[in-house]
């Protein structure tokens, strides 16, 4: 009887030792930006993309607008939101940063600037999505205007820039 227990214990110890030798550990860094009062998400509930690629069309000598369907999530659907840009966005040529293309941003059909605009809660149509504190779909549109290049003529190359949107609850 003792021999059976000893052999069983040895078999289990060997099994666990083998499993431990083939294990691998993975670490995933997780980040979050939290504002418990208001957020701007894609209409499917996912975060806004970290980057978008604007498409230049030689046929029209300009960029196509990039549109993202968004929704406002809030903890107080009686209040609207104030939306603004932290800086005027431009696309700068990577090799010649003085060559810049102005970028326009529209939210809910209104042009954004560094001065905040207020969008009333009635215009956001909270609860129309079926969720009390989620707005109806609002379009966020980003467009670079190749007809207004500064620093020289538009040339082939890589251009990059930032669009930083600040969204706060109105008072």
UniProtKB/Swiss-Prot annotation:
Gene3D superfamilies per UniProt: CFA/I fimbrial subunit E, pilin domain
InterPro entries in UniProt: Fimbrial_CS1-type (IPR007540)
Main location: other
Signal peptide: 1-23
Source taxon at top rank: Bacteria
GO cellular component, one term: pilus
Pfam entry (one): Fimbrial_CS1
Protein location: Fimbrium
Induction description: CS1 fimbriae are only expressed in the presence of the positive regulator rns.
Intrachain disulfide bonds: none
Keywords per UniProt: Fimbrium, Plasmid, Signal
Similarity remark: Belongs to the fimbrial CS1 protein family.
Biological function: Fimbriae (also called pili), polar filaments radiating from the surface of the bacterium to a length of 0.5-1.5 micrometers and numbering 100-300 per cell, enable bacteria to colonize the epithelium of specific host organs.
Protein name: CS1 fimbrial subunit A
Source organism (scientific name): Escherichia coli
